[in-house]
């Protein structure tokens, strides 16, 4: 997957070096690994979502990481001051969390307290209700019948070059680069 922005576009929130390793090496390795595992697996023509919901072992892990990273890298834009959602998504934050600020606080807390490696997700259910989940390793909310909308990667490779062991600082900074138009389209 090609980035929709130049690697330095997310600075200072995510450095060009982190993008080079995270997208250029980690994600590329998952793609290469999955391609090597697919032949003869029965999943050759399946979508990533289908693979993530049905596969096990290495196929699941690599497909899950590809799907997670596609959603992750696809949600960013250059840093923006006062970056906030609008429309139906903003209304859903108010309905399901009390306010956008309350949502952000809970989301960051879930990301900061996830033990080990994984992802914190905002997803919608079939009725449009918003949910925050912690998913370990390569798991994705599609496995629970949810529609993934927004994710923060809490694997150390996502932030360690820029933030070292300060995961909460990384999570707090990510709000500046969320492209809410992308998230709103996913929610629609």
For each feature predicted by the language model, list its residue ranges.
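Feature for soluble, non-membrane regions of globular proteins
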Residues: 1-188
């Amino acid at each position: 997957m090609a980035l929709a922005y130049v690697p330095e576009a997310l600075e200072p929130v995510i450095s060009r070096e982190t993008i080079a390793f995270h997208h250029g090496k980690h994600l590329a390795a998952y793609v290469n690994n999955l391609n090597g595992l697919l032949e003869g697996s029965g999943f050759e023509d399946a979508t990533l979502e289908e693979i993530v919901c049905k596969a096990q072992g290495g196929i699941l892990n690599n497909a899950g990481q590809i799907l997670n990273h596609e959603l992750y890298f696809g949600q960013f834009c250059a840093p923006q001051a006062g970056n906030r959602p609008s429309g139906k998504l903003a209304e859903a934050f108010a309905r399901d969390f009390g306010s956008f600020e309350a949502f952000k606080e809970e989301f960051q807390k879930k990301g900061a307290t996830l033990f080990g490696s994984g992802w914190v997700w905002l997803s919608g259910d079939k009725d449009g209700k918003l949910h925050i989940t912690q998913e370990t390793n390569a798991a994705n909310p599609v496995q629970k019948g949810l529609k993934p909308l927004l994710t923060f990667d809490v694997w150390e490779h996502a932030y360690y070059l820029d933030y070292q062991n300060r995961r909460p600082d990384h999570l707090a900074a990510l709000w500046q680069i969320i492209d809410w138009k992308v998230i709103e389209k996913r929610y629609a």
